[in-house]
Amino acid sequence: MKNPMLEAVSLVLEKLLFISYFKFFSSGAPGQDKAGNTLYEISSFLRGDVLEVPRTHLTHYGIYLGDNRVAHMMPDILLALTDDKGRTQKVVSNKRLILGVIGRVASIRVDTVEDFAYGAEILVNHLDRSLKKKALLNEEVAQRAEKLLGITPYSLLWNNCEHFVTYCRYGTPISPQADKFCENVKIIIRDQRSVLASAVLGLASIFCLGLTSYTTLPAIFIPFLLWMAG
């Protein structure tokens, strides 16, 4: 039997992480910085390498397959609306991506390095050092990625691009950045001042907007949720 409280907390976490994900893809022109300079050298990438695109809030991951091709997981609402590969294989727009996150539908797809990077620099195999895990052979990594190509369920917390890459590279799907996000939120929740602050904001909204269902319910539910989870 599912725990309603845990489901509610999970939903809140996913919505907060979604905001960061939206900011991740809100700027940049594929493959170049503002001065038009290329931020990476494709010839230095090896088949099976993990490519990382660091941003302010999140890092996007992919597996290099060779020949300027990168396999990566991308949310895309169009996958739930049409089977036309001519449309779904086009570069995923921000609108398609955001709705895909909400709809929890994605695909592990192949794009060019330029489209994958989306205007940012690329780090190579940085996870090997940060996770201190032994990587599989590069060819096995690439083959694992190729076998997973296609539509897949999506979750910012439980099945994202980092889970895909770590499974291919190390054999175990993990997402340190999602775990870190949850830990930070947990710290905030455990701080009882968060309960007081949310209660004050709730009362302020009732005072300013009046006693209605859309002000009263959040004013009661959010402090209660933080108190129970703390």
Curated annotation (Swiss-Prot):
Entry keywords, A to Z: Acyltransferase, Cytoplasm, Endoplasmic reticulum, Endosome, Lipid metabolism, Membrane, Sensory transduction, Transferase, Transmembrane, Transmembrane helix, Vision
Induction of the gene: LRAT activity is up-regulated by dietary vitamin A. Under conditions of vitamin A depletion, LRAT expression in the liver is induced by retinoic acid.
UniProt keyword Cell division, yes or no: no
Transmembrane residue ranges: 195-215
Record topological domains on the Cytoplasmic side: 1-194
Main location: endoplasmic reticulum
Catalytic residues (UniProt): 60, 72, 161
Superkingdom, natural source: Eukaryota
Keyword 4Fe-4S: no
Gene Ontology biological-process annotations: retinol metabolic process; visual perception; vitamin A metabolic process
Gene Ontology CC annotations of this record: endoplasmic reticulum; endoplasmic reticulum membrane; multivesicular body; perinuclear region of cytoplasm; rough endoplasmic reticulum
InterPro entries, per the entry: LRAT, LRAT_dom
Protein name as it appears in the record: Lecithin retinol acyltransferase
Organism, scientific name: Bos taurus
